[in-house]
Design a protein with these regions (language model features):
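Active-site groove signature of glycoside hydrolases
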Residues: 150-166
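Beta/alpha (TIM)-barrel catalytic core signal, keyed to glycine-rich beta->alpha loops juxtaposed to Asp/Glu
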Residues: 9, 40, 163-306
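Acidic (Asp/Glu)-rich catalytic clusters
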Residues: 48-50, 107-115, 147-151, 205-208, ...
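Active-site mouth loops of central-metabolism enzymes
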Residues: 63-76, 126-137, 258-259
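A short, structured active-site edge motif that brings together acidic residues
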Residues: 116-130, 161
């Protein structure tokens, strides 16, 4: 197995045989022991953005669209209990978006949290669908609404949501300039993008505007920008080396692997072992899942340190 020529079948087979550590001796997959401890909730810095948060974060976009998601559809008390449990366990990163409809819910949960400890990310939807079609105002108007919904003076990170075109840095230039101005004013601490195609990811690599990027990553190519993880990993390494913060999402293939314990562990070992993903977000639906992933992440970190 050498470099980018490694056969994908062998790659997946290595994971299945529990020999994923062999992949990390390859420069493409090698860990740089960047994580300072075995603590799954240790503080990490997102690239050169200056934003610090926990290695493990909570996503709120499970089965989400049109300002609706798992958290907004189930009993509110249960969702608040879930958010509070994440906080009590030490999670300090919460991932939101306009299309998830979770701003007001987190605002309620934050009544029992220390805002200064939190990293709140949310995202602006610019594509068709997702939100009412007439709601595409300038980014400063959108961010003002977000702050009111969240009941907060500032937002840590605001991203353009689900970019897929290779020219998004041109088509979104006006919104990007507004977000840059909001950052200069301290209304947001950073800006960036979540991408859902490899061309969009490569465009982000070339853009100095991107502070932090969400990337879809797992060792199985499920719900990713390419079915071959090697192609995605190469760009992720470049993003990291350029100083951009890298947040890993879809670690369990958009939930498709959530009932396969071995593949969950393989995914955690793989993503943490890359050395180029700053933190990971998981869309939790039960308190037990939070506890479970904290334990699994700790074990994965222990493997890396050994």
């Amino acid at each position: 197995m050498s470099g980018l020529n490694m056969n994908r079948r062998k790659f997946i087979g290595a994971l299945g045989l529990g020999t994923a550590h062999l992949l990390f001796s390859n420069p493409l997959y090698a860990a740089d022991t960047r994580f300072s401890s075995l603590d799954p909730l240790q503080k990490v810095t997102l690239g050169n953005s200056g934003i610090q948060t926990t290695l493990l974060g909570m996503g709120t976009g499970v089965h989400a669209t049109n300002r609706s998601s798992f958290l907004t559809r189930q009993d509110e008390a249960k969702s608040l209990e879930l958010l509070h449990h994440a906080y009590e366990k030490g999670i300090r990163y919460f991932d939101l978006a306009d299309t998830y409809g979770t701003h007001q819910m987190l605002a309620k949960a934050m009544e029992k949290m220390d805002r200064k400890e939190l990293t709140i990310t949310t995202k602006i939807w610019e594509r068709g669908g997702g939100i009412p079609e007439n709601e595409r105002p300038p980014a400063d108007v959108v961010v003002d609404r977000f702050r009111k919904e969240l009941n907060t003076d500032y937002i840590d990170l605001v991203q353009l949501h689900c970019m897929v075109d290779d020219n998004w840095t041109d088509s979104m230039k006006a919104q990007m300039d507004i977000l840059e101005n909001l950052k200069a004013k301290g209304i947001i601490r950073g800006h960036g993008v979540s991408v859902h195609s490899l061309p969009a990811m490569k465009a982000a690599l070339e853009s100095s505007w991107v502070d932090v990027i969400h990337v879809r990553i797992n060792p199985y190519g499920i719900a990713m920008d390419k079915p071959d993880p090697q192609e995605v990993v190469e760009v992720i390494h470049q993003l990291h080396n350029s100083g951009k913060g890298v947040i890993g999402m879809k670690l369990v293939g958009d939930g498709k692997l959530q009932n396969d314990s071995e593949k969950i562990d393989n995914a955690l070992n793989f993503v943490l072992g890359l050395g180029s993903v700053d933190m990971m977000i998981i869309g939790f639906e039960e308190k037990e899942q939070i506890d479970n992933y904290i334990g699994r992440t700790q074990k994965a970190l222990a493997k890396l340190h050994n």
